């Protein structure tokens, strides 16, 4: 990596040439932008939820029926977790952990760079369900293209949702662990 530009199959000569050309900024790959996502039906579910055409309990039932579980190791049911959050007094904040540190794991990066609005709509649906006033998206430092892309696309979102804050990880696997992540935010 030169600056924040990945150099695939890097040789000493290629790294030196990249630096000499001043190519240090991350390359953002082609992705589904806001306009395309909306034209293909994106944000419809969020709009229906916010307008009251779909209730929070409807979404929670879908989560329960799907048996969707967290991937943090315990496999905790997502619907049950969201209900537990709703049972706590506000104000509520939400943290989205994009600091995947497991060797060879790049699923978060893939969605953040290719289908960013699917990620954002899911985030905003979750925030709406649990009545979160603020959302903190925690991304690993090794994802410079995602760190550059997300604020650009977040700025395109219509007003009316929770405040979205970006936080850059400290670059160590332990930062993705829940309590360390909260301390870092």
Model regions and ranges:
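Feature of Fe-S/electron-transfer and energy-metabolism proteins
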Residues: 1-185
């Amino acid at each position: 990596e030169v600056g924040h530009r990945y150099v695939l199959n890097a040789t000493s000569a290629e790294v030196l040439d990249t630096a000499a050309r001043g190519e240090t900024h991350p390359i953002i790959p082609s992705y589904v932008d806001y306009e395309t996502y909306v034209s293909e039906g994106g944000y419809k579910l969020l709009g229906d939820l916010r307008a009251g055409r779909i209730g929070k309990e409807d979404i929670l039932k879908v989560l329960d029926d799907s048996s969707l579980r967290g991937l943090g190791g315990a496999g905790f049911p997502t619907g049950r977790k969201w209900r537990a959050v709703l049972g706590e007094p506000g104000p509520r904040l939400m943290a989205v952990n994009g600091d995947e540190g497991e060797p060879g794991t790049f699923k978060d990066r893939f969605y953040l760079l290719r289908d960013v609005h699917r990620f954002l709509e899911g985030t905003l649906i979750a925030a709406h369900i649990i009545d979160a006033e603020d959302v903190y998206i925690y991304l690993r430092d090794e994802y410079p293209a995602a760190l550059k892309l997300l604020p650009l696309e977040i700025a395109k979102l219509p007003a009316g949702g929770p405040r979205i804050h970006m936080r850059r990880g400290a670059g160590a696997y332990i930062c993705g662990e829940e309590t360390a992540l909260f301390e870092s935010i």
